[in-house]
Amino acid sequence: MGGGHAPGAGHRATTEFPPGWSPEQILAVLKDVANDPGEPRRRQYNGRWRCAGERYGVQVAVLVNSDGRVHTGYPLSGHGVVRNPDTARDPANPTVADRAGNRISYFTDSLLRLVTTRVSATDLAHYRELQWSGEWEELADTLSAHFTHTGFQLTPDEFADFEKLLNSFETPVPDCTYLNDRDHTLATVRP
């Protein structure tokens, strides 16, 4: 639990819990949603479980590892939830991290547009949710697992964007097995 969605954290293209929510309250809400979600749990391609529910007027999603540990949690919508801009803090002087963020943002959006009609509506909604909330590593990991496990046939354009997306991340990323093994993933799905 890194606190990237805490109020005022300011991470690029990331949703934040409402102002005034303490780290303790956020953690309690995430644990509560993980244990008692408001909708059926859904197993993701990378093995995590997606749990979602509303607490205190805020729609929250929590991803739980197969061992029961909370991997991440984030607000989706509700009173006081904000999403930070998808831009560099100082666009005139972008940092290396800003440039990586630009690549990740662009190739994520492009790839999801390309596969929109070829993935289920439920999967696409989850992928857009991860993109909206700023969970880019998780999105790359679960897309990698999806494409690897299902034999999803990428077109050359889709593969090019997917390869550029995966290569935009510094690895290893904690608990992102498929993203961390990107060479194998790319070899498996290469058209």
Predicted regions and their residues:
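Compact soluble domain cores
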Residues: M1-E54
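Histidine (H) residue identity feature
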Residues: H5, H11, H71, H79, ...
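Short linear motifs in intrinsically disordered/low-complexity regions
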Residues: A6, R12, P37, S66, ...
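General structural signal for secondary-structure boundaries
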Residues: S22-P23, S77, S120, T155
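Amphipathic, positively biased hydrophobic alpha-helical segments used for protein targeting
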Residues: E39-P40, G68, N84, A145
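Active-site or metal-binding loop neighborhoods of secreted/extracellular toxin and effector enzymes
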Residues: Y45-A97
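C-terminal-biased regions
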Residues: T95-P191
